[in-house]
Structure formats: structure tokens, C-alpha cells
Swiss-Prot record:
It is found in: Cytoplasm. It comes from Acidovorax ebreus (strain TPSY) (Diaphorobacter sp. (strain TPSY)). A motif ('KMSKS' region) lies at residues 270-274. Its cofactor is Zn(2+). This is Cysteine--tRNA ligase. Binds 1 zinc ion per subunit. SUPFAM superfamilies: Anticodon-binding domain of a subclass of class I aminoacyl-tRNA synthetases, Nucleotidylyl transferase. Monomer. SMART domains: DALR_2 (SM00840). It catalyses: tRNA(Cys) + L-cysteine + ATP = L-cysteinyl-tRNA(Cys) + AMP + diphosphate.
Length: 458
């Protein structure tokens, strides 16, 4: 196949061919469910949703795993603050996650494992690492990974151990042999709730964050699989540590290809609660429809930084409206996409080059121009069919355009009736006012011998 993907591990575009012909196995780091999902989560979910959609469009079967971290220091802290159990908090946040993902048109992954369901596999991997001399139990009961005993450490981040150590601000403490060593198993503390403690050969405790993904990935996809993805902020230390754990335990390459989506900023500043520019998905969906948010993400390349602002969202809304306006002109005909021809070939070439969604979106606009000129049902059908691969343009055009105008059909028809009554009473100033008010809301009235109809402004 002709698909090329940028591999963070090799720092190069690589021709993609799955380990098992015709079947892609992909793992993406999911959410830590102590709070509502934010914009950064939305970007990652949308980016890898597009990836799995295009892999399937390319004729490949996809086993897609996106995990849920449901045990973590932040989860424990929040549950204690709320006076609820860990399970109560995480169940509630997982329900909210699914609602947000569904709103954004995210297709459910094949598997969505909860970390707490895989503690036995984590303990097995820790035992293997200890048996190979790659892990040790410290005096405080924690089990740590001995980073300097794994020769490949730093290959994902591209840094030597000395460089990493120079940047490490944490002093050697709690029995660590080296500041770079990281925890595999956290010894239980007396003050911690009972529902965050598991029995183990190392004493009561809970798993560290990094070992969770290694164990779940190997359990569901095998010791070596095709793609591992996540946000750029996870490249180090999380993904570096996953490689050390998994390859240290199995002696095999963990993931052949590593993909990382770019950061999201707000008005050119890093999104953070301390700056007061932190937005949940639900905050954004109060102001913008979900497809506009998805379009805003998709029209930038997944590896590029993405700057959130009302100006950019307004622009995304206006751009998406232009595509739906084209679809409103003629009923799309069902089409069988011929990937070797014209617009479809250009779309495919864009997506086959590291999921080039900006170029693919440009093809959609060119095709929308063709629909505007020709009013061709086949061209409209192709526009809708190509949009589906990005999770776009599947709504009824009139419904989308009416929602954007802030009016429903009944409200528009009421205004049309009021205008007709004004004209009948020869109150032409009022009739013109109604027409102009609707135009300001993106609604164009069309008068004819049979009555008045409306369409969205182009």
C-alpha cells in the first residue's frame, strides 16, 4: 500500500505495512478519569479517530485499543475530596467521556480497557522485570525500574541518559538508585482508601502509571504491534518508559511505529487552569456545535500545534457552513468512490501522506465549488462520501444551516408568514425589516408565484 506515516521513533516518514497482512493493531493512550475531558483530549480523540477511519478506508481491519486510567494519584485525591469511592468517581467520568466522544463523532475503539481490570498482568510484567534484574524493591516498599540497566532507554525522546539526568530535577529519594528510575508498583500508605490497594508479592499497593499501558497493550494486542499513539506530551517520560518496560520484559520491539499529536494552545498560550484559559469539551460545546469543533481540529495536521480561539472557531464554523451550503443545493446521489479519479485521487494522496487532513479538506472545498457550479448530484454525493472519512458532512444540510442561524424551521416559517401579512397590509417597511433580519441570520428568502421559500446564505 502507499500509506506513509511519520514515526517519532525514527524521526522520518515511513511506508506503512502492518505486521500481520491486512490487520492493523493500534494502541492509543486514553484519559485519566478524574475530571471532565478538555480540549487536549478532544484533539487526541479526533486525530486518532481519523487515523483509524482512514486505515479502514484503505481496506485494513483495525483492532484499536484506547485505554482508561482509572487508578491514579489525582483520582484518589479527587475521590477523597468529593467523599465518594474511586469506582463512583471513575464510572461517572467514564460516562461523561463517552457522551463527549459521541458528541464529537468519535467512533468507539475496539477495546477500551480499564487499568484496574489488568492488575494481574501488570504484576506478572513487574515480576518478569525483577527476575531479569531490571527492577528492584526499595526500602519503602515501592518497586522501581532500573533505567540504566536497559540499553535502549532514550531512543524515543532522542536523548542520552546523561542529558535526561541533567534535566531531572527530582533528587534521589525513597530508595531510588538513580533519579531517572521510575515506579512500577507503589506501596500502600495507611491513610489511603481501601479500594486503591491490591495484594501482591511486593506487599499491598497499586500499579504505577507507566506499567498500566505496557500490560494492557501486550494483553490485548500482543507483545509487538503496529502503532502506538498519544499526545506529544506523553513522548517522555510515559512512552519512553513503556518501551523500557515492555521491551525489557519481552525482549521484542513493543510498537513498530509511534505517532504523536501536537499540543493545543489557547490564544497562543499553553492551556492551563492557572492561566484561566482551561476549557473542557463541554465548555466549548456550549458555544459551538460539535461538528465545528471537529472541523477546527481536522483542518490542521495532527502533528502541528493547534491554537484555539473564538476567532478560529468562528472561522471554522463559517468554512463548514460553505461546505454544507453546497450540499444544500442538490440532493447527493449515492456514489461508489473511485480512488483513481479526480477529486477522490487527490483526497487519497493527501491522506496517504501522513494523514494530511489540511490538504484533504482543501479537496473538499474544491469539490464544493464544483457542486456550486454544476449542481451535480454525483459531485454532491462524492463530497459527502469523502467527508465521511474525516467524520464530517453527514448531517442534513438544512438542519445544520438552520442550527447555525439559530432558528428552527417553525421559527423561519413564522417569520415568512409575518412578512407575507405585512406585504398584504402594504406595510412594506416591515416586510423589508423581516427579510433583512433573516438575512443577517444567514437566511435568504426567495419569492415566487407559488410563495416564499428560504435557503442559507452562501
Amino acid at each position: 500500500m502507499s500509506l506513509r506515516i511519520y514515526n517519532t521513533l525514527s524521526r522520518a516518514l515511513e511506508e506503512f505495512s502492518p505486521i500481520e497482512p491486512g490487520h492493523v493493531r493500534m494502541y492509543v493512550c486514553g484519559m485519566t478519569v478524574y475530571d471532565l475531558c478538555h480540549l487536549g483530549h478532544a484533539r487526541s480523540m479526533i486525530a486518532f479517530d481519523v487515523v483509524q477511519r482512514w486505515l479502514r478506508a484503505s481496506g485494513l481491519a483495525v483492532t484499536y485499543v484506547r485505554n482508561i486510567t482509572d487508578i491514579d494519584d489525582k483520582i484518589i485525591k479527587r475521590a477523597v475530596e468529593n467523599g465518594e469511592t474511586i469506582r463512583s468517581l471513575t464510572d461517572r467520568m467514564i460516562d461523561a467521556l463517552h457522551q463527549d466522544a459521541d458528541a464529537l463523532g468519535i467512533e468507539r475503539p475496539t477495546h477500551e480497557p480499564r487499568a484496574t481490570a489488568y492488575v494481574p498482568q501488570m504484576l506478572d510484567m513487574i515480576g518478569t522485570l525483577q527476575g531479569k534484574g531490571l527492577a528492584y524493591q526499595a526500602g519503602n516498599g515501592d518497586v522501581n525500574y532500573a533505567v540504566r540497566k536497559f540499553p535502549g532507554y532514550g531512543k524515543l525522546s532522542g536523548k542520552s541518559l546523561d542529558e535526561l539526568n541533567a534535566g531531572e530535577r527530582v533528587a534521589v529519594q525513597d530508595g531510588k538508585h538513580d533519579p531517572l528510575d521510575f515506579v512500577l508498583w507503589k506501596s500502600a500508605k495507611p491513610e489511603e482508601p481501601a479500594d486503591v490497594k491490591w495484594r501482591s508479592p511486593f506487599g499491598e499497593g497499586r500499579p504505577g502509571w507507566h506499567i498500566e499501558c505496557s500490560a494492557m497493550g501486550c494483553a490485548l494486542l500482543g507483545e509487538s504491534f503496529d502503532i502506538h499513539g498519544g499526545g506529544a506530551d506523553l513522548q517522555f517520560p510515559h512512552h519512553e518508559n513503556e518501551i523500557a518496560q515492555s521491551e525489557g520484559a519481552t525482549g521484542k520491539p513493543f510498537a513498530r511505529l509511534w505517532m504523536h499529536n501536537g499540543f493545543i494552545n489557547v490564544d497562543n498560550e499553553k492551556m492551563s487552569k492557572s492561566l484561566g484559559n482551561f476549557f473542557t469539551i463541554r465548555d466549548v460545546l456550549k458555544e459551538y456545535d460539535a461538528e465545528t469543533v471537529r472541523f477546527f481540529v481536522v483542518r490542521s495536521h495532527y502533528r502541528s500545534p493547534l491554537n484555539y480561539s473564538n476567532v478560529h472557531l468562528d472561522d471554522a464554523r463559517a468554512a463548514l457552513k460553505r461546505l454544507y451550503t453546497a450540499l444544500s443545493l442538490v440532493a447527493p446521489a449515492p456514489v461508489e468512490v473511485d480512488w483513481a479519479e479526480g477529486y477522490a485521487a487527490r483526497f487519497k494522496a493527501a491522506m496517504d501522506e501522513d494523514f494530511g487532513t489540511p490538504e484533504a479538506v482543501a479537496v473538499l472545498f474544491d469539490l464544493a465549488g464544483e457542486v456550486n457550479r454544476s449542481k451535480s448530484p454525483a459531485a454532491a454525493g462524492l463530497l459527502k462520501a469523502l467527508g465521511r472519512h474525516l467524520g464530517l458532512l453527514q448531517a442534513d444540510p438544512q438542519d445544520f444551516l438552520k442550527a447555525g442561524a439559530g432558528l428552527d424551521e417553525a421559527a423561519i416559517q413564522a417569520q415568512i408568514a409575518a412578512r407575507a401579512a405585512a406585504k398584504a397590509a402594504k406595510n412594506f417597511a416591515e416586510a423589508d425589516r423581516i427579510r433583512n433580519d433573516l438575512l443577517a441570520q444567514g437566511i435568504v428568502l426567495k419569492d415566487s408565484a407559488t410563495g416564499t421559500t428560504w435557503e442559507a446564505a452562501q
